[in-house]
Amino acid sequence: QSRKDELKGTIKLVFQPAEEGHAGAYHVLESGLLDDVSVIFGLHVIPNLPVGVVASRPGPFMSAAARFAATFTGKGGHAGVPHDAVDPVVAVSSAVLSLQQLVSRETDPLEAAVVSITILKGGDAYNVIPESASLGGTFRSMTDEGLAYLMKRIREIIEAQAGVNRCAAAVDFLEEELRPYPATVNDDGMYGHAKAVAEAMLGEANVRVAARSMGGEDFAFYARRSPGAFFFIGVGNETTMGPAAAVRPVHSPHFVLDERALPVGAALHAAVAIEYLNKHDCS
């Protein structure tokens, strides 16, 4: 704020609301608040880098990601006479195994993709075949096209396996409640700009090339609207990253961050924005 009158343009600060799963960035864009934004930059804490280190990469950085749920409906019955029932548990099991082939047999091995079944529910009695059973999970790809292909095939496989096993299947991709995220793709120019500013501020050795990540990130919605760059910022230290420590990921209840990273991130955000305005005079 003390340098507000020196800015050669406008800087908007965006706290990412509902970033985890509910596509907050999509709704921020829908509000129109960022319609006049030329470029955008973002930071995300990362525990396996120390304070004072940032990392990113040009081009595709984080995966497109989505969720799915499916319910298989058969005919319940006594487990001792399975021929009088239509077993949805067998149908679910067949679908789980068939879905594994999407990555191993239908995805180019040089392209990253994930299909993980993380929810499996059936009956609640040892001697009863349930009327229905369900599964759910996540699927990811480093491209939006790859995600669309996986979505199409997941539906086809689930419906086909249900049919083979005489069941009906309902597939839900939760697109309103948990909107799929596109891939996070860093613009080459914006990545280069942010990298140069970070190197001048932190030193070249402290600005690293990050590996691609299969994590999903709603910054991707912003980066599709305006050229952008997204960076990881280290929040680890000798205690959280030391020989006796197990680095706790950001979604762990045991995650700990070194708050000395906060002023580093704030300063980097400010410097990246101010230097961009100085070079492009957006006033």
Summary of predicted features, one role per range:
Residues 3-130, 217:
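Histidine/acidic-residue-rich, glycine-tolerant segments that coordinate divalent metal ions
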